[in-house]
Amino acid sequence: MIYKILLINFFLVFSSYSNDIHDSFENFVVGATLNLNELNTQKSNLFLKDFTYLTPANAAKQTIVHPKPNTWNWAKINKMLDFANLHNLDLRIHGPIGPQSSKWIKDDIRTSDELMLNLVEFMTESCIKFSKEPSVKWMDVVNETILSSGKWHGPKPGNNKWENPWLKIGLDENEFPIYILKSFEIATKLAPNISLVFNQNAGFQPRLWDKLKKSVKYIRSKGYRVDGIGWQGHLLLSKSTYGFVNDLDKGIKDLSNLIDWAHENDLDFHVTELDYFVEDKSNLNNDLLDQKMIYSRIINLLKDKSKNGIVTLNFWDMGERFKKGKGYFQSIYSKELEPNPSYELLNNILK
């Protein structure tokens, strides 16, 4: 009889423990990015082995879908949607209004009316289309709108620079960008079943994130939804993220505080484009060990914060990505698609 009681108690304790484990992970969603040319390849097979959360790279951006008047091209994102539906994946659409815009939009002769018309057309058709897709769970509405200085990201001369031409549309009576309000207005109205994300690059410069926090509250004050905020996490790509890596304890604390603020304000938190940049590969083995250590700190934090609200993590690409004139972006697999040291960290969050 005593044996039976002990056995029952053990079962109850074990069941409770198992449920706690399950509950602690159900708010933490982990995935990766694939490009169109990577579908039905070894890389996509590796993706399907571990993930069900996909970001379809840049296939949904304005520069591809609606680069200029009377020009539309849904072919790339349609193929990504087909892939997601075939494999029962959840998608975050990365087609935000921001710097990754067509040359036509960036041309200096563009008027504010022309920019607004293209924005309204693109956002309207995108929201109508993706709201009908059961695989689409999240959508980046705007991206890279604030500089690390805290100033609004705006236009530059020419059409071949990293710039944000949409600011030319103007500011409202409270000095807030009209294009941001219009983007969230359209998404709120036409994508009611998609979680709307305000995505942002750089590190944890206080002026930047203070402005983003005020922006979220201002957008909501107009009656529009903001359901989540995103931090890209392109580590060591620019000076704006050097501080996160060079003073990791402070960087993790800053990230922790931002996630807490998000959850306290009924926002999901997304790490949207995590990778690790190295300028050359002369010391790659050590660089990859550093990457693993930094990723471990980030992932452990995200796991812990998922107890308080939804947290997602997206690895930008699966393998090494080379950018001419820049260097090498490292992810969880090597150029040859062999697991990098960072891949080992997935054992604790995917199993």
Residue positions per predicted region:
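Aromatic-rich peripheral "rim/lid" segments of glycoside hydrolase catalytic domains that contact
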Residues: 66, 108, 129, 140, ...
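Glycoside hydrolase catalytic-domain groove-lining segments
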Residues: 75, 82-85, 173-199, 206-282, ...
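Short, acidic/polar
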Residues: 34-50, 118-127, 207-219, 292-301
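Sec-dependent signal peptide recognition
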Residues: 1-9
